[in-house]
Amino acid sequence: MSSIKSSEVVRSTIVDTWRWMWPDILMRILPMAVIPFLYIAILHLPLAFLGLTWGDVPVQLATGLLVGICMAAFATMWRMFIVGPWFRWPTIGDHFLQGFFYLFINAPVEELFFRGLVWGAVTQWTGWIGWGWLASTAAYTLYHRLGKWSWRSVGGVGLAGLVFSLIYLAQPTPRSLLAVIIVHGFTTAGFLSWGDEVMYRRWKRGHGE
């Protein structure tokens, strides 16, 4: 890892990313993607129970992009000034690989599981949407500790989770995960990929290059 004060920059390549990505897909992404569908299949529930509806697509896209850009900036700043100065500068190919994963795989699956399944199931069991909101937000935040994220990082996740939940809660029923997924993807990419690029640019200016 490099820091703003390092004399050299450590790169992150496709090989480096793939080394952690494929076991993550097998051990985390696939189970989290399958379990929600098993739940609605067993209980004969519609896809809308999981937030799998289009909703008002133009509004969903506009909300997702506008809030997503703001959240990407927030995540980058949190990474730089709260979490710490350490970074690995991704290659162009690695940026594309990480971006694809965060936007099109990780964000949809995490939202399907937490805002879709956990929110829906707890609301169904308790009869109050507030418990669904609380359980899904808390579970989403704290599960990052399983990945050995620092508490400073988890704090940022918690704030982001509140935004994701509010976007979902504010919608008319049946709610759609589309806007939330877009915001989630931008936020994660800002924190874990684009943030590295910004930190590298700061390093470069600091070293007069």
Language model segments and positions:
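Hydrophobic alpha-helical transmembrane segments
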Residues: 26, 61-65, 100, 130-135, ...
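Membrane-interface helix/loop boundary segments of multi-pass membrane proteins
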Residues: 90, 110-135, 169-175
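Aromatic-anchored segments of alpha-helical transmembrane domains
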Residues: 37-40, 137-146, 162-166, 189-190
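C-terminal ends of transmembrane helices
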Residues: 74-88, 140-150, 192-193
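Active-site His/Glu-centered metal-binding helix of metallohydrolases
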Residues: 108-113, 117-118, 122, 142, ...
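Functionally important transmembrane alpha-helices
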Residues: 33, 149-209
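Small-polar-interrupted transmembrane alpha-helices in polytopic inner-membrane proteins
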Residues: 71-72, 103, 129-145, 158-161
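Juxtamembrane helix-loop-helix connectors linking adjacent transmembrane helices
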Residues: 12-24, 44-109, 119-125, 201-208
